[in-house]
Amino acid sequence: MRSNVNRTRRRVARRVDPEKAGSMLLRIERTIRSIPRGKVSTYGGVARAAGYPGAARQVAKVLRRSFGLPWQRVLGAGGAIKLQGDSAIEQRLRLEAEGVRFRGRKVDMKAHEWQPRRAKRK
């Protein structure tokens, strides 16, 4: 019986145009910077707002590699803090300092979810 793991490892990585990848990361970074104080978004929400639905992992990558971003405003699905340990505590404290309310362990998304403006089409 063959293992699915071997098939997965043998997949050829998609070739990504470095210029397009850089543009994508910059758009994601700009989107994160545009989340106002007191509002939050999910990894998937940021990806959609940046024009890359399904690129939630790329949002996490940008947050890990960029400095000066309001990282605390990006949460897991449903408003859950996905960080562990002291980082999770720091994220919650930063959000509470911005006036974000929690319901148990999750942010009250009805009150605090950021709704980006949609660009008008011509």
Residue ranges and their predicted role:
Residues 2-122:
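Nucleic acid-binding interface residues in structured DNA/RNA-binding domains
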